[in-house]
Amino acid sequence: GSSIDNRMWKRGSGTWPFKCERVFIQHNRLMNAHGPQDSYSAHIDYGCKDVVIQYNLSFNNEGGFAEVLGDNVNCGFRYNISINDGYREDPDGLQWNKKGKIFWVSTFCGGPTRCPSEGTFFYNNTIYVDSTLNPEIYVWPESGDVHILNNLVYMESSGEILESYLETQD
């Protein structure tokens, strides 16, 4: 994020497709995004179909590594490397609010109505977290069809246990 221009909200991610179809984002270095919201290496905004983020190097992004919003179909992250992403601590102390995350899936789709996605995926990514960080994995309730498979997450020995929140509605 930046405060150079007052139209910037002190947030931003390396890239974020929005209402796109059939997009591949690959072979990039996504680094140093900083701010109190978003600030991921990349995030898939709402209204996308068949968006794949693959073969990228991500590091030092305050918000986290991979974010997927609602109302998407067959979108996700595969074959990426993440190093020390998700170092933000939530100022309100809420576990899921603004704290840094490795993977985050939400149902936000532009307004108060929440929208699940179909076929969200995170697979074959390699994630390194040093001992000073404790990012989360968080999937909002009713996020739809989400697959988190075969990812390698390495945390240095003195790091905290990785918190994961996969909630269901009662």
Segment roles from a protein language model:
Residues 1-170:
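Glycine- and acidic/polar-rich repeat regions and solenoidal domains
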